[in-house]
């Protein structure tokens, strides 16, 4: 699976099946985030893959800048279905354009599964998103 985004070129995050590149086409698109989600901006950070506490695999990414709602947030998307399982928005309390830019995954209890994500937003805040529960 190849995960990517449009960066500053648009509001899109996608997953592609690249197991057989000799016959690559439309059927290789596993899913694409809808550009109509008001919390999805121009996501320029990496789309990360995580094994979560529930033993499922997810794509995790920062929402990026210029979303309609102008807040920083984290998306957790089921890797195989493309369904948004969790969307956690940070309450920055400001009246300014913001967005989560880059993230780092953490296994804080050493069990091989991600239970926290750290991310920096456009205005310099560092956020911790607890995914353990």
Mark where each language-model region is:
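Extracytoplasmic/lumenal domain signature
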Residues: 1-133
